[in-house]
Amino acid sequence: MIDETAYIHPSAIVEDGAVIGANVRIGPFCCIGSQVEIGEGTELKSHVVVNGITKIGRDNQIFQFASIGEMNQDLKYHGEPTRVEIGDRNRIRESVTIHRGTVQGGGVTKIGNDNLLMVNAHIAHDCIVGDRCVIANNGTLGGHVILGDYVIIGGMSAIHQFCQIGSHAMVGGCSGVVQDIPPYVIAQGNHATPFGTNVEGLKRRGFDKDSLNVIRNAYKILYRNGKTLEEAQQEIAELAENNQHVKIFSDFLANSTRGIVR
């Protein structure tokens, strides 16, 4: 079904069964599969391919040569009906690739709202990206990676499969991340190691001085006081009883499956 207010360039191919919302614009030489749904106000520039069971929300901008919903690169995948879900107001720049999920990983690759995926970024199968994240040019997420909200991934950085990166964390450019990065932390290098808290980013998002101080304190307990991970987790868990930001930090440590960058 194609809404009467949608614009589709004569050279674009939209297969029967696709759902195209109001005021959608589909540019030259785009290819849209039969199981695709594109929400109101979303714009596809030129040469965009959207395939598979893919749902794209409202007011997204998708630039030329992006590929969304294509078969993933997991060797165990044999064409099962998995999908991609993308929220609202995302900017997906040139040559970005977003692959569909796997049955083993829950069946869905999911992108939230208000994200910026820069040129050549790759989102592998079963990744979950929160809201207001930035993945810079040539950034790569391996399969099953989870990003919290407001995460920044520097250019040419790669995140290993199954890693989690907490909200408001930042990964510097040209980094290789093989373990989980807690919320609010800056990490860089190959393999990535912590370099402090993302103070400037937190200030921009309205964190007050008291909140910044308790986050710094939690960071020092984990990284600067010579404690074992178990000792640090216990002390941070006690502080978390009285502060929501420390609770987020503490819960992330407790739920880590790949270990924490140290």
Swiss-Prot record:
EC numbers for this chain: 2.3.1.129
CDD domains: LbH_UDP-GlcNAc_AT
Keyword Transferase: yes
Pfam families reported in the protein's UniProt record: Acetyltransf_11, Hexapep
UniProt cross-references to InterPro entries, sorted A to Z: Acetyltransf_C, Acetyltransf_C_sf, Hexapep, Hexapep_transf_CS, Lipid_A_LpxA, Trimer_LpxA-like_sf
Keywords: Acyltransferase, Cytoplasm, Lipid A biosynthesis, Lipid biosynthesis, Lipid metabolism, Repeat, Transferase
GO cellular component: cytoplasm; membrane
Highest taxon of source: Bacteria
Coiled-coil blocks: none
Catalytic activity: a (3R)-hydroxyacyl-[ACP] + UDP-N-acetyl-alpha-D-glucosamine = a UDP-3-O-[(3R)-3-hydroxyacyl]-N-acetyl-alpha-D-glucosamine + holo-[ACP]
PROSITE patterns: HEXAPEP_TRANSFERASES (PS00101)
Single GO biological process annotation from the record: lipid A biosynthetic process
UniProt GO MF annotations: acyl-[acyl-carrier-protein]-UDP-N-acetylglucosamine O-acyltransferase activity
Localization annotation: Cytoplasm
UniProt key word Nucleotide-binding: no
Cross-referenced PANTHER family: ACYL-[ACYL-CARRIER-PROTEIN]--UDP-N-ACETYLGLUCOSAMINE O-ACYLTRANSFERASE (PTHR43480), ACYL-[ACYL-CARRIER-PROTEIN]--UDP-N-ACETYLGLUCOSAMINE O-ACYLTRANSFERASE, MITOCHONDRIAL-RELATED (PTHR43480:SF1)
Function as written in the Swiss-Prot or TrEMBL entry: Involved in the biosynthesis of lipid A, a phosphorylated glycolipid that anchors the lipopolysaccharide to the outer membrane of the cell.
Subunit structure: Homotrimer.
Family per similarity comment: Belongs to the transferase hexapeptide repeat family. LpxA subfamily.
Annotated protein name in UniProt: Acyl-[acyl-carrier-protein]--UDP-N-acetylglucosamine O-acyltransferase
Name of the gene encoding the protein in the UniProt record: lpxA
